[in-house]
């Protein structure tokens, strides 16, 4: 410790440029100036610790100044040393203890002065108490302080007496002196440490039982000694007495005495031996007692700490209570409050206030109102509304439930169109823009020209029957609040159409379209809507009661209202009159043309409307499992917010029940599509570019790297153009792209910043809508259930959706659709796929999903880029869904149309569009799927046009091989479409796809547009789609794919799938059913498949669905999820994306294989139960859960098994199947299933596959997936269309993977895709699988999911084919599974047929497969999922799922999708 040495070391080690001399001078200065204040001591102490590398120099100078200073200053230096010594360990500078230990003995001798010795002694005591230094060291210090100080000082003086010695010599002598105590201390440390170690060892090894045994032994020996003592005392011979010897007189006496003496001596000897033993055993007993003393003392200390902690806590609580009581006393009297609280039944707040606070009774209105606000983005109000919405989870739930009830009633009315109108009405009442209510009154006959009219015609009557469900008081309060809002906003009621005036789709479309722009500028969208609609208790009642009789006109009115509000003018009538005529569409188209972007949107809207009714219906159905017709209600919502291509498309899908309305819509959409499509076409490239540029220009989006097809495909351009209308209402949702495609912050709707979008639903309107939807949806316990509220929510959703769509679409018109589809659409389709209930729910879930999706998309704009790729996935999903059932086709068609209008159609030449349009009417269902396929592929094709889209499409496909495959299979219906697809990627492929979809639809009852193509497509598409869906389902619930071959029915009959659909949705026309079912299935697939699916699952429906569907996973955050739904638009985006990313993580963790294997392993049943989707969910959720809560995984499994089962058992005989579904909140209900499957699929496939996508897509999975998908963006689509089908061979592996569910099932029906055929949907999945799924997906997955994917993924992807089966059904699986269960069994029974075996590998072949397939295929038809939804809520309540909340950030999709930087979920919750 020489000064020189110290300086040298200081120089050498000093990080600063200062020299050793500078350090020493600084030390001298600091030590000299230190005072006894805490600031001075702690400051210098911190400085010393920071400069720990100079510890030796510091200690040396400390000692130097200790010697030179006066006693008071020495005390200060000791205080400093104490502070350093005690804090050095905590600050990783323990070296100071050793350094000071060297000098402390000498230092202690320098502070023996009575004035400071007591303080020094106290420091030593503290060190002793805190075990800073060993006891021996402390003793030595005390000795130095007291006695040795004198001798030590004498030695020092002796040193100083040699003037001849140099400073160095003196220093060495001092060091020698200091080293002695140091050595002693070190010795003592070594000797003391063992003691401490011994103590800790004793405490660790102490066994109370050993002590007890020792004590018992001692007691026994004591007893023995006592006994011997007594024996000795009873001896007649006193062995020790010599007197007895004197008494001996004769020999006899002597012998007797001798004998007695010997006995006595032997006993005495025994006694002595016993005592010896006791002495020997004593030490061990003593040691045991000592150890026990140490042990119990240590325990006592710990207990004391805990007890003190509790005491402290209790004191703090008491203090806090006192403070609160004091504050409470200062609060004014409730009566004296300047702003008295509203009464329990007071209307919800309006204007800038959150319309959700009074959601309870007003909820039906709120969604629409919120949607309207979104449509006419209210700068601050909207955001606040969203936030309020998020805040009022409970209220929202309550209102949702109410809406659900209402919806259920309307749903009960099995009128396809009716369901839609009801939804429209409900939506209107919710929105309180009540144009819908008036519309219901007015529009009932006009809009649903074909099916809708008939179904809707009873609307007036239906209203009253539903009165029981309606709270008139609440409605009145809502109306009054709406009125006040309108008054506040100063919106003229003149603009609103008379409630009694029926509006033709054209009228509403054109009229509303015109208002939409006006609405957009309006600061209070809600007010605008209200101003447009005369709100009367009757109107709201009709809306709330979901009068299904409200014919298309009513829907039209509402939808037009919503559209105008949404800036998505496609009227419900267009939606409703899918097959009706081109005139409404034309009108819409012309009107749309006025709003270029809108027109595209509208086109999509009609399509989506087409499905929308179904969607609404689905939601309604979800609401009431028994209401198969609820699908109609969604028509309006579909129109309203189905505008978002995805959402719209899926909503459309949900229109299975209202097949006619979709048909009507198809007609409208046809012409509308043809009109808007050109615009879209023209705008698509620019939109794509704009979106692409927008995303590119927005680092936030790129950072999020969400695989949002909308984002990628729609980019900013698509949103700007395609969403002009949407934006008007959607600007609030996400960053609004100016019409020219420049991202613009739309202050009107309080458009959040990109960060906000990431964090927030992105579009206040969307959020609000989603929240509303959620609120409305709360009725449905599960996400599906929640979605179920969609009737009310559906309306809200349409409005919301448009908002969200706007939000969503801003990221890519064309892509939007695809993306949305996966997200909302997919989930919806899933729901649709599931069954009536699912149908009902799907819309519900999907609409919510879509809303959320939109939010998410708002949030995920960055994701949009990825979504470009995903977009295709969406498309694919759509296609898959389409395949799944013709019923999905309408939605697909709608979606496709939307996509086309947005991006796909735009991408397609007018002729193609015409083809699509023409196809759309008859082939609407099939065509849209084709479109989806096209979109998926086409989305890619537009992607072709806008390169990223296709790539991503492919990537989307690839990541969602299942979905991709399905989509492609569906789109191309593999073989036929494949060729066509290649033929005219835009026109023919779409057409072909449509055709095949149409064919699917045709088998169901829709005439195929292209005879051969359609037929082939139908067969292939049905089979492929179904199989693909099954595959998806299987993939989703890979382990469960055996069980969950909901696909089997699908597979069982390519057309069987259609049949199943029909069976499942008897109320729907076969074609419509199939279409819707397909659509639903597709929706589900999309959801699960795509990022979007993830997002759908997790974003859109999943939020609720997640909440519910992912109950185990997410919904646990269940309630939060509701909030999240509203709040997490970005979150959803995140979530969806995040989910995918998460999924990637999870998928990676669980890896698709793992996820499926793990999740589905455990989720196998789950998947089976949940229908694959659940499995997927489980897989993906399970995986996370495994990570997070393996028990949850089991829980998930269990949850699915039990919870879902109970939830579903009523729907699904196979509780395991149901299991998966519950897990997939969404799967629970048809609606639920899609999200779940999406989750599964999205999670495992969608999320995981999408994860893949995200992984591949995000972590540049696109490299992998892009390599697959991107490699030949258009080709992959083509391949998907063609290759996937051609790749049916891979399906066999998937079949194998599928647990034979796919493989065997495949073989059964698989003409082109034999293996997949089994699943019906599997064929599609299979080809895609082979191409993307197996080749791409597997490769992608393997890439993404590495080995897991390779094997597992292969399996998974095979399973995608198989599990896809599960996923198809899984995707739809749970949902379908869930919904399908009742019908599924019958469907599945036959459909399952051969496929059933494989499908039911996990669950009973007949049952599970039937379930699975039925679920997968018809699952949505099954309303049973509805209960699931409810149970899901329970699931939401479940903690395991609660963990999902966190997982959602993972859903954020890990790094690739780190989507919103802040997952946004955590904060929301």
Swiss-Prot record:
Give the organism the record lists. Answer: Mus musculus (Mouse)
Q: What is this protein called?
A: Regulation of nuclear pre-mRNA domain-containing protein 2
Where on the chain is Phosphothreonine found, per UniProt? 376, 536, 617, 742, 751, 782
What are the recorded GO MF terms, alphabetically?
RNA polymerase II C-terminal domain binding
Which Pfam families does the protein's record reference? CID (PF04818)
Sorted alphabetically, the Gene Ontology cellular component annotations on this record are: transcription preinitiation complex
Annotated region Disordered: the residues are 329-445, 489-524, 572-594, 647-686, 716-867, 919-1013, 1033-1140, 1154-1183, 1204-1328, 1368-1414
Q: Residues bearing Phosphoserine?
A: 16, 374, 392, 492, 495, 498, 504, 583, 612, 633, 682, 684, 735, 738, 749, 777, 781, 788, 836, 845, 919, 947, 984, 995, 1086, 1117
């Amino acid at each position: 410790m020489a000064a020189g040495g110290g300086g040298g070391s200081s120089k050498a080690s000093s990080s600063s440029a200062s020299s050793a001399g500078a350090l020493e001078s600084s030390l001298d200065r600091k030590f000299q100036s230190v005072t006894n204040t805490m600031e001075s001591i702690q400051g210098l102490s911190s400085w010393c610790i920071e400069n720990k590398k100079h510890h030796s120099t510091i200690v040396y100078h400390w000692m130097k100044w200790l010697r030179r200073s006066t006693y008071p200053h020495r005390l200060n230096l000791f205080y400093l040393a104490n502070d350093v010594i005690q804090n050095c360990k905590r600050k990783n500078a323990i070296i100071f203890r050793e350094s000071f230990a060297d000098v402390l003995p000498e230092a202690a001798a320098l502070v023996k002065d009575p004035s400071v010795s007591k303080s020094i002694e106290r420091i030593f005591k503290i060190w002793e108490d805190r075990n800073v230094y060993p006891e021996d060291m402390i003793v030595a210090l005390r000795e130095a302080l007291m006695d040795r100080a004198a001798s030590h000082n004498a030695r020092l003086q002796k040193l100083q007496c040699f003037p001849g010695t140099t400073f160095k010599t003196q220093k060495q002598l001092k060091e020698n002196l200091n080293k002695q105590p140091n050595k002693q201390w070190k010795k003592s440390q070594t000797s003391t440490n063992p003691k401490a170690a011994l103590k800790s060892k004793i405490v660790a090894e102490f066994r109370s039982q050993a002590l007890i045994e020792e004590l018992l032994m001692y007691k026994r020996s004591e007893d023995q000694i006592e006994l011997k003592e007594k024996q000795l005392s009873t001896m007649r011979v006193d062995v020790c007495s010599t007197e007895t010897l004197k008494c001996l007189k004769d020999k006899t006496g002597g012998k007797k005495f001798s004998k007695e003496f010997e006995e006595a001596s032997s006993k005495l000897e025994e006694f002595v031996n016993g005592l010896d033993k006791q002495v020997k055993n004593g030490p061990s007993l003593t040691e045991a007692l000592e150890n026990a003393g140490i042990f119990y003392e240590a325990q006592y200390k710990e207990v004391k700490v805990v007890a003190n902690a509790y005491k402290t806590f209790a004191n703090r609580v008491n203090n806090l209570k006192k403070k609160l009581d004091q504050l409470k006393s200062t609060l004014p009297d409730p009566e004296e409050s300047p702003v008295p609280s509203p009464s329990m039944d007071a209307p919800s707040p309006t204007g800038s206030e959150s319309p959700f606070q009074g959601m309870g009774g007003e909820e039906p209105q709120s969604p629409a109102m919120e949607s309207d606000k979104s449509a006419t983005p209210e700068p601050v109000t909207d955001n606040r509304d969203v936030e309020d919405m998020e805040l009022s989870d409970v209220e929202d739930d309550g209102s949702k439930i109410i809406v659900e009830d209402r919806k259920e009633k309307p749903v009960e009315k099995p009128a396809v169109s009716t369901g839609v109108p009801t939804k429209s009405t409900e939506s209107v009442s919710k929105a309180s823009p009540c144009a819908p209510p008036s519309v219901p009154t007015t529009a009932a006959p006009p809009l649903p020209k074909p099916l809708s009219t008939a179904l809707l015609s009873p609307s007036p009557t239906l209203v009253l029957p539903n009165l029981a469900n309606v709270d008139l008081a609440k409605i009145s309060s809502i109306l009054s609040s709406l009125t006040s809002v309108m008054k506040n906003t100063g919106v003229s009621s003149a603009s609103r159409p008379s409630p009694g005036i029926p509006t033709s789709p054209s009228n509403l479309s054109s009229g509303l379209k015109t208002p939409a722009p006006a609405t957009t500028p309006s600061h209070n969208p809600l007010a605008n809507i209200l101003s447009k609609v005369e709100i009367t208790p009757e109107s709201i009642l009709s809306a709330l009661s979901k009068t299904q009789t409200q014919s298309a006109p009513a829907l039209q009115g509402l939808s037009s209202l919503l559209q105008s509000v949404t800036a998505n003018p496609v009227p419900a009538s267009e939606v409703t009159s899918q097959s009706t005529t081109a005139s409404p569409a034309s009108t819409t188209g012309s009107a749309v043309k006025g709003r270029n972007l809108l027109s595209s949107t509208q086109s999509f809207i009609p399509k989506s409307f087409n499905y929308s009714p179904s969607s609404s219906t689905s939601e309604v159905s979800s609401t009431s499992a028994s209401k198969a017709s609820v699908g109609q209600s969604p028509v309006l919502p579909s129109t309203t917010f189905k505008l978002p291509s995805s959402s719209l498309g899926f909503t459309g899908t949900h229109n299975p029940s209202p097949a006619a309305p979709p048909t009507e819509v198809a007609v409208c959409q046809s012409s509308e599509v043809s009109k808007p499509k050109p615009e879209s076409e023209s705008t698509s490239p620019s939109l794509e570019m704009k979106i692409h540029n927008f995303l590119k220009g927005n680092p936030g989006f790129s950072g999020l790297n969400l695989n949002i097809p909308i984002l990628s495909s729609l980019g900013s351009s698509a949103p700007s153009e395609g969403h002009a209308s949407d934006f008007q209402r959607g600007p609030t949702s996400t960053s609004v792209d100016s019409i020219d495609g420049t991202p613009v912050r739309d202050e009107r709707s309080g458009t959040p910043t990109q960060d906000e979008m990431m964090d927030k639903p992105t579009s206040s309107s969307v959020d609000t809508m989603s929240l509303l939807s959620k609120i409305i949806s709360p009725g449905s316990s599960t996400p599906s259930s929640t979605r179920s509220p969609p009737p009310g929510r559906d309306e809200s959703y349409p409005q919301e959706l448009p908002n969200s769509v706007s939000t969503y679409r801003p990221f890519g018109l064309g892509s939007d659709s695809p993306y949305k589809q996966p997200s909302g659409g997919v989930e919806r389709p899933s729901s649709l796929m599931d069954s009536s209930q699912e149908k009902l729910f799907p819309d519900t879930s999907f609409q919510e999903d879509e809303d959320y999706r939109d939010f998410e998309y708002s949030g995920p704009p960055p994701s949009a880029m990825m979504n470009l790729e995903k977009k295709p996935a969406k498309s694919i999903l759509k296609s898959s869904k389409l395949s799944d059932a013709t019923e999905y086709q309408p939605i697909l068609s709608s979606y496709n149309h939307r996509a086309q209008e947005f991006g796909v159609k735009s991408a397609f030449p007018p002729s193609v569009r015409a083809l699509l349009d023409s196809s759309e009417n008859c082939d609407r269902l099939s065509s849209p799927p084709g479109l989806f396929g096209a979109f998926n592929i086409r989305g890619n094709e537009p992607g072709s046009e806008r390169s990223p889209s296709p790539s991503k499409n492919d990537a989307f496909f690839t990541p969602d091989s299942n979905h991709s495959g399905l989509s492609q299979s569906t789109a191309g219906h593999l073989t036929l479409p494949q060729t066509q697809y290649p033929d005219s990627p835009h026109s023919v492929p779409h057409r072909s796809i449509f055709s095949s979809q149409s064919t699917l639809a045709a088998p169901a009852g829709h005439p195929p547009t292209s005879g051969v193509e359609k037929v082939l497509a139908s067969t292939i598409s049905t089979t492929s789609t179904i199989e693909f869906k099954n595959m998806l389902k299987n993939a989703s619930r890979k382990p469960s794919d055996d069980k969950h071959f909901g696909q089997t029915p699908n597979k069982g009959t390519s057309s069987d799938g259609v049949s199943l659909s029909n069976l499942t949705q008897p109320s729907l026309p076969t074609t419509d059913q199939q279409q819707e079912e397909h659509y639903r299935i597709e929706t589900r697939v999309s959801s699960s498949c795509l990022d979007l699916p993830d997002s759908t699952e997790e974003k859109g429906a999943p939020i609720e669905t997640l909440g519910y569907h992912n109950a185990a996973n997410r919904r646990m955050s269940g309630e939060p999820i509701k909030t999240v739904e509203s709040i997490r638009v970005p979150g959803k985006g995140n979530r969806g994306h995040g989910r995918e990313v998460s999924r990637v993580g999870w998928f990676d963790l669980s890896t698709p294989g793992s996820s499926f294997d793990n999740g589905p392993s455990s989720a196998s049943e789950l998947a089976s139960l949940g229908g694959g989707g659940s499995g997927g969910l489980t897989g993906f959720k399970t995986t996370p859960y495994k990570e997070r809560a393996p028990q949850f995984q089991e829980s998930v499994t269990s949850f699915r098994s039990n919870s879902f089962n109970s939830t579903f058992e009523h729907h699904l005989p196979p509780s395991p199947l149901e299991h998966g579904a519950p897990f997939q909140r969404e799967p629970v209900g048809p609606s639920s299933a899609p999200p779940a499957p999406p989750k599964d699929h999205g999670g495992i496939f969608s999320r995981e596959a999408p994860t893949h996508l995200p992984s591949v897509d995000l972590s540049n999975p696109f490299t992998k997936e892009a390599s697959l998908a991107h490699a030949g963006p258009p080709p992959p689509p083509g391949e998907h269309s063609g290759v996937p089908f051609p790749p049916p061979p891979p399906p066999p592996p998937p079949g194998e993977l599928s647990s034979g569910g796919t493989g065997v099932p495949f073989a059964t029906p698989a003409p082109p895709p034999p293996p997949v055929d089994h699943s019906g949907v599997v064929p599609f999945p299979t080809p895609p699988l082979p191409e993307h799924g197996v080749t791409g997906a597997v490769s992608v997955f393997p890439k993404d999911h590495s080995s897991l994917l390779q094997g597992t993924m292969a399996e998974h992807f095979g399973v995608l084919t198989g599990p896809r089966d599960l996923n198809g059904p899984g995707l739809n699986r749970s949902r379908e599974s869930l919904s399908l269960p009742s019908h599924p069994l019958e469907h599945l029974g036959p459909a399952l047929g051969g496929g059933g075996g494989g499908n039911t590998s996990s669950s009973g072949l007949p049952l599970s497969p039937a379930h699975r397939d039925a679920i997968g295929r018809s699952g949505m038809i099954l309303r049973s999922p509805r209960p699931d939804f409810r149970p899901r809520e329970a699931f939401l309540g479940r903690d395991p799922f609660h963990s999902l909340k966190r997982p959602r950030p993972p859903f954020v999709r890990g790094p690739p999708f780190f989507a919103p930087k802040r997952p946004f979920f955590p904060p929301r919750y």
